[in-house]
């Protein structure tokens, strides 16, 4: 998302091309990306066999894949509890079901090539080949940040939420709060109606102000008030790192030790730490790592997460191929308010960038 709701959309698996880049100017933009499950930091968390609860559930329910034989589940929310039920239905033995709310924890994973043993927070060591993590979600606020919003951390929900959005950008779904399916659908419908109302008003103004103005169809639509019922913020424990160090950015090989070292060397702001360690600068662009990185820095500086802030996201939101960017450049043709007069007096057009300007009047040879 760029200035004034100029949006770049990637369309894949199209009949004429594997990828198509669509450029659009949106009168209203609705952002509803849902939530991304967040990893947990502990020693050995990059060992094969350590999986997020959502990934485990998809393997079982969508692909009929049994992800392991003996599992340790660390849960802080219903997603982790649902993973336990799915694992048991798939014939996986649950050797330890750990409740974050009760202070239970995973400290370390041991094994050569895959998970073999798991050290728990109470000192016990259990034999397992699967560790399932269900410790929270990250709200992907990147597109909102590109619209000028700086998300604010809510410690009670352990998530970032939007702070201030322009009128032409609206958010709905999990990125704004929690709720039942019916509540989320109702909020989405109300958001769509509000976005459509604002888009109609923008279209009316554009038709009135256009160089080749034409009478708009009827009066300017009335402005709908934002009467949406805010979605609730369900309490969630702040669980980002165990008592041990582990990987924060799996794609850039950045560990929590690296972040602590960066703070010791003076790179103690979230922006400086990012550039010094390259955390969040890999293919995922911070979708999995941003919150954990901020949590490690807050702990190292003995500060609240809300005071650490966030980095500034820049387009693109997701990686794109150079092939999708190749091709002819299509730009809008822009005309001044005098263009009709120029044409009526025999002006020959001259393309000056996007603008159509008069080059000369009449026939130069005849003159």
Describe the residue ranges of each PLM region.
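Residues forming the flavin
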Residues: 1-335
